Amino acid sequence: MATIENFATVRYTSCGVTETKVSNLAEIGLESAVTLTKNTLGDTYGEDSVLTYIITVTNTSSSPISDITVSDDLGTFEFGTQELTPLTYTPPALLLIDGQDTSAQLTVDNSVAGSVTFSFPTLAAGATANIIYKATVNEFAPLEIGSSITNTATLESSSDCADGTASATVTVSEGANVSVFKQMSPNPVVCGDTVTYTIRIYNYGNVPAEDVELTDNFDPAPTNITVSRDGVLLVATDYTYENGTLSVPAAGSTESVTVPAATFTRDIATGVVTVTPGIVEYVITGTI
């Protein structure tokens, strides 16, 4: 809340002498003529997530306010001597006033790095405006467990009594993010030769992928197969291979395979976060 401070000065003459007296400092609180709130649809984010934000401006005064601007810092934070912005404004934006689409009145400016500014001309007494927009998580966003992004909206207008700030925080989602890559060699292969299948299981998430089970249906089915995991040859009891279908671990096995969580490294010079996935690699060989 802003404060209005004021004091009075009295000058007078007594017995031919001019004197001055200053009153005490009087203070009153100045409440804004608007309420400003900021919310998100969902409260978590991940790599490349698209977040939806809603900024709500309500004119609680008895007079209209004009020249309204709302600036969002897109979560900008300090990193060493740099300022990094983990969110990228993703157009378009919508403006709803008392539930009516008035987006034609909305001006959006994202030409200044680290912010986006929304402007509209007026808001009637008692009216409510909702600015709805999206932002995409970019390469500067922290992804480790416990990370968060807080972005703050700042409202200004032609009235000294119509301003304010509001923030919203999203936390990084926790979980594994698995992808699988497979390749075969040589190419081409001749009947009777040995073929090698390489399967890599990547985890781009911040939590390990546990109890991983691999199933592969080969057609045609190779014979005399060998199976290795991360360079270690597995014995026949470590997997099941029947009718061309490979299962690792073996059916009924108590063995648990885990793909480690990714590691996240922020470049000191650029601030960019690099994701290095956890990996488990299987190599299967057999005769075609």
Residue ranges of predicted features:
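Exported/extracytosolic protein signature
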Residues: 1-288
